[in-house]
Structure formats: C-alpha cells, structure tokens
C-alpha cells in the first residue's frame, strides 16, 4: 500500500493573484507542513496545475469565469514557492478535474489538499474514487480552501456522501 499526496492547484493566481482569497492564503503553511510530512517519508507527491492558454477568455470556461488566470508559463501559473519540493510530479490539467489519473493501486491511500475545495478538489476526489473505488481517498480540511466558506462546506458534505474521508489534522 502506497501513500500519495495530490496538491490541487496551489498556484500563485489562486493564492495571491487574480483569483486568490484570504482562505487560500491561510492554508499555505498547513499545506507546506503536509508536503514536508510526505516528502520526509519519501511518499509520492503530485502537484496539479490549472493550465490555460492565452485564448482562455474565448473558451467556454473563460466565458463563464472571465478572469484570466493560470496562463501557461506565467508567474500566476507557478506553484506557490513555499510548497516546491524535489522528487515530485506535476499534472497540467486544462479543466477542473483530471481524467487521466494513472499509476495508483486499489489499496493506495490518496490524500488531496489545495484549492478550491468546491471546484477542483471535489472534482478530482470524485474522479479518483470512481476510478479507484477500493482506494482510501481523503481530504484534510485544514489544507483546503473554498471559493467561499459556504461553498467549501457544501463540497465537503458532497465528498462525505461519496465515501471520501474528510478530516481535519490538528496543526
């Protein structure tokens, strides 16, 4: 059984940039501690990066969320510097959820943290649960932020309903 940490979209634009909020800023130290915990054990760490091109505003998503963000190669697209570690992997995803998760075993423990709980975290948690129904999928609330506290609460309830283990690690 392996342990995997997936850090969802902890990018500059979602923390301090175009779409950042105080909730996202408040979890950076918790996520940093979580990444260090996994790195110290030599566990598998994957960072996802929301990745858009310069024509983002012309896309269906860009028309519904007309805020240019996470444009490939820009400063806003980069992972928050405090979180970078060696021996990690990156997944550049063009939308909320990544459909091509591979390499996990049915008995793995897969933990998700990051932003935004009500968009990309919930999307990826549910995709992983559908693809690996026997894996233990968990979300640490102390390392997640929603667009709003209300939307985060709704997403957490949805994940609990779908047998995602939602917990809060004391820091």
Please report, for each region that a protein language model flagged, where it lies by residue:
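Phosphate/ribose-phosphate-bearing ligand recognition and processing surfaces
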Residues: 114-123, 138-149
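Glycine-enriched alpha-helix->loop->beta-strand junction motifs that scaffold or abut catalytic
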Residues: 112, 132-134
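Internal catalytic-core helix/loop-beta-alpha segment
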Residues: 69, 73-121
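Short, conserved acidic/polar surface loops in the N-terminal third of protein domains
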Residues: 56-60, 101-103, 123
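Active-site beta-loop-alpha junctions enriched in small/polar residues
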Residues: 50, 96, 142-144
């Amino acid at each position: 059984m392996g342990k995997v940490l997936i850090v969802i979209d902890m990018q500059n634009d979602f923390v301090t940039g175009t779409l950042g909020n105080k909730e996202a800023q408040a979890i950076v130290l918790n996520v940093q501690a979580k990444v260090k915990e996994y790195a110290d054990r030599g566990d598998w760490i994957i960072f996802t990066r929301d990745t858009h091109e310069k024509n983002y505003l012309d896309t269906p998503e860009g028309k519904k969320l007309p805020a240019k963000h996470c444009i490939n190669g820009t400063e806003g697209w980069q992972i928050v510097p405090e979180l970078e570690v060696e021996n990690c992997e990156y997944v550049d995803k063009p939308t909320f959820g990544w459909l091509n998760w591979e390499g996990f075993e049915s008995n793995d423990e897969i933990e998700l943290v990051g932003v935004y709980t009500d968009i990309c975290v919930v999307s990826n948690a549910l995709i992983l649960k559908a693809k690996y129904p026997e894996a233990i999928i968990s979300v640490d609330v102390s390392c997640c932020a929603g667009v709003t506290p209300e939307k985060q609460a709704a997403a957490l309830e949805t994940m609990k309903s779908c047998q995602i283990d939602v917990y809060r690690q004391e820091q």
